[in-house]
Design a protein with these regions (language model features):
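Conserved ABC ATPase "signature" region
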Residues: 124, 128-151
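Conserved ABC ATPase signature
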Residues: 155-159
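Conserved catalytic motifs of ABC-family nucleotide-binding domains
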Residues: 176
Length: 274
């Protein structure tokens, strides 16, 4: 007869399986409701709600301090929201994020990796964190895809900023995530390299059906890549839609002109809260 501890372990295992099976395959990958973040009485993110559809590329756009990075940090579980709900891949990120984090990844040129480790060592660390098989082959494969094979034995700290951006993208793709979150994915890349990186991300999305959410100041990049744009200002989402719809609604020539129109509109201002 099973002991009490064995029965408890079995029940825990069954509950984990049920939880994992409950992670849905609905058309909505990210659902955010009334998300708020306060810092010392200032609303950095002010009661925003939005959805991201499966297989789409969506952009968070806004000026410095608009709340983009804070929003991404809450989606990733790096910051706890002051209020609101975050549901990703069918899981409540406040209580069950362990079920979906293995299916996600993140890239930012502003989040450092150990500078004294080689590129290969850095990528190997992340491959092991995700519990991947054939780690050496996977590291080689993703390095080849990102055209950084010749840097594998080089310490990360000795690379140029553009090369580091490629390594960050390689790290983010190491586990072939269903959901890829990107903060300024082409920062520090020259125009030719940035164009190549955009093409690579677009190809990855088309090949795998992955969902991409990115924050960017590059309106040309957003206009080319994204199916949907969330325009942020002063911690709120002031407008959203496809690049084409936004351009038409504001009667502008391109998305950069829309961005400038919203940025110069004084209607929205960050609220102070006690």
């Amino acid at each position: 007869m099973a002991s009490k501890q064995q029965r408890q372990a079995l029940n825990n295992g069954i509950n984990q399986i049920i939880d994992a099976m409950s992670i849905n395959v609905s058309p909505v990958v990210i659902e955010v409701r009334s998300l708020t973040k306060k810092y010392n009485g200032i609303l950095a993110v002010n009661c925003i709600s939005f959805t991201v559809q499966r297989g789409s590329i969506t952009a968070l756009v806004g000026g410095n301090g608009a709340g983009k990075t804070t929003t991404l940090s809450m989606l990733l579980g790096l910051l706890l929201p002051s209020e609101g709900e975050i549901n990703i891949l069918g899981a409540d990120m406040l209580t069950k994020r362990h079920l979906v984090l293995p299916r996600m990844n993140f890239s930012s040129p502003y989040v450092g990796m150990p500078a004294r480790l080689t590129v290969s060592e850095n990528l190997t660390v992340y491959a092991n964190l995700y519990g991947l098989d054939n780690v050496k082959d996977r590291v080689t494969s993703v390095a080849k895809d990102l055209q950084i094979l010749d840097t594998l034995k080089t310490q990360l700290g000795n690379l140029s900023s553009g090369q580091k951006t490629r390594v960050s993208l390689a790290k983010a793709l190491i586990n072939e995530p269903e959901l890829l979150i990107l903060d300024e994915p082409t920062a520090s890349l020259d125009p030719e390299s940035a164009d190549w990186a955009r093409g690579h991300l677009e190809s990855y999305q088309q090949r795998t059906g992955a969902t991409l959410l990115l924050a960017s100041h590059n309106m040309g990049e957003v206009e080319r890549l994204c199916h949907k744009v969330l325009m942020m200002k002063d911690g709120t989402i002031v407008d959203e839609g496809s690049p084409q719809r936004l351009i038409a609604n504001y009667d502008k020539k391109n998305l950069e002109e829309v961005f400038l129109e919203i940025a110069r509109n004084k209607t929205h201002s960050r609220d102070f809260v006690p």
